[in-house]
């Protein structure tokens, strides 16, 4: 699989996802600087975590206007897959690839901890192979991770099976309906706040990130 990992000024998780894809999936991965375009056809483009453009204005707000996003739009228009992790999810909502917004955590504090995720919508094809009873331990690290949307959008996400994951038990950031990740209507654009790339090695304590990335890469 050919994958592009976009690096914006302030990205700090691009190396993590790049190494995971290279070392554990043997994928063909290119790192793309935000001023450059996608000079080849990729099956998947990843917007990594971090603090793109220093989170000025709002988290992810400025990255949507970065030069590389023109190529990302062309990639999406041709049916390519797009995956945003944490700040990448914020970028996807700011650029209106996904509905809703990621706002300040209910605690008004930065949160860095491992949370429990469960399957969201039963009919979402991305997580179709995941047992509805399975719980995943995945880290979060954000200050603006509270998913917010209007009641109409929340109903649409439910009706269209577009909720990828929910927080189970504790809702760490106050996300409406405990939403931790969602997909586009065609399920080719995926955004989530937790970091699967940080749960890929027993040295760090968790391995459930592999379950998540297997689902994303296999969908």
From Swiss-Prot:
Its EC number is 6.3.5.3, 3.5.1.2. It is found in: Cytoplasm. It catalyses: N(2)-formyl-N(1)-(5-phospho-beta-D-ribosyl)glycinamide + L-glutamine + ATP + H2O = 2-formamido-N(1)-(5-O-phospho-beta-D-ribosyl)acetamidine + L-glutamate + ADP + phosphate + H(+); L-glutamine + H2O = L-glutamate + NH4(+). Its main location: cytoplasm. The active site is at 86 (nucleophile), 195, 197. GO terms for biological process: 'de novo' IMP biosynthetic process. Residues 2-219 form the Glutamine amidotransferase type-1 domain. Keywords: ATP-binding, Cytoplasm, Glutamine amidotransferase, Hydrolase, Ligase, Nucleotide-binding, Purine biosynthesis. Pathway: Purine metabolism; IMP biosynthesis via de novo pathway; 5-amino-1-(5-phospho-D-ribosyl)imidazole from N(2)-formyl-N(1)-(5-phospho-D-ribosyl)glycinamide: step 1/2. GO terms for molecular function: ATP binding; glutaminase activity; phosphoribosylformylglycinamidine synthase activity. SMART domains: GATase_5. One of its GO terms (cellular component) is cytoplasm. The keyword Cell membrane does not apply. Part of the phosphoribosylformylglycinamidine synthase complex involved in the purines biosynthetic pathway. Catalyzes the ATP-dependent conversion of formylglycinamide ribonucleotide (FGAR) and glutamine to yield formylglycinamidine ribonucleotide (FGAM) and glutamate. The FGAM synthase complex is composed of three subunits. PurQ produces an ammonia molecule by converting glutamine to glutamate. PurL transfers the ammonia molecule to FGAR to form FGAM in an ATP-dependent manner. NCBIfam families: FGAM_synth_I (TIGR01737), PRK03619.1 (NF002957). Part of the FGAM synthase complex composed of 1 PurL, 1 PurQ and 2 PurS subunits. This is Phosphoribosylformylglycinamidine synthase subunit PurQ.
């Amino acid at each position: 699989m050919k994958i592009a990992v976009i690096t914006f000024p302030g990205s700090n998780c691009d190396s993590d996802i790049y190494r995971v894809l290279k070392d554990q999936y043997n994928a063909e991965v290119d790192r793309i600087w935000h001023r450059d375009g996608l000079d080849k056809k990729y099956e998947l483009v990843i917007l990594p975590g971090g603090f793109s453009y220093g989170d000025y204005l709002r988290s992810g707000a400025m990255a949507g206007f970065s030069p590389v996003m023109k190529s990302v739009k062309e990639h999406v228009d041709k049916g390519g897959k797009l995956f945003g992790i944490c700040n990448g999810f914020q970028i996807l909502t700011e650029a209106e690839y996904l509905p809703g917004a990621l706002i300040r955590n209910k605690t008004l504090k930065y949160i860095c901890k491992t949370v429990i995720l469960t399957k969201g919508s039963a009919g979402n094809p991305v997580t179709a192979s995941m047992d509805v009873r399975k719980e995943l331990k995945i880290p979060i690290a954000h200050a603006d991770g509270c998913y917010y949307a209007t009641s109409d959008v929340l109903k649409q996400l439910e009706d269209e099976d577009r909720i990828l994951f929910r927080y189970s038990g504790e809702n760490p950031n106050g996300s409406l309906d405990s939403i931790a990740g969602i997909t586009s209507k065609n399920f080719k654009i995926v955004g989530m706040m937790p970091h699967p790339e940080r749960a890929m090695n027993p040295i760090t304590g968790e391995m459930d990130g592999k379950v998540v990335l297997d689902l994303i890469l296999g969908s």
